[in-house]
Amino acid sequence: MRPEKHSLTLRGHRTSVSLEPEFWQAFRALAAAEGRGLNELAAEIDAGRGAERGLASAIRVHILERLTRARDAVGR
């Protein structure tokens, strides 16, 4: 699938992020599971990423880390 571009607002500033549809679906599901909006979760991820990593990559890594932790918790 081709990446889809969506606008997010991070601490009052608009930005666009391109992610594959599957990542947008997982990102929405993670935010909903935490009772948070996409903008809030994206702002947290943005604040924690290093300058060497773009926001889209940071979101993908966050999703992967969360899914890995959930899988490991079930396997215990």
Model-inferred region functions:
Residues 5, 9-63:
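Amphipathic, hydrophobic secondary-structure cores in small proteins
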Residues 60-76:
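Short, solvent-exposed charged binding patches
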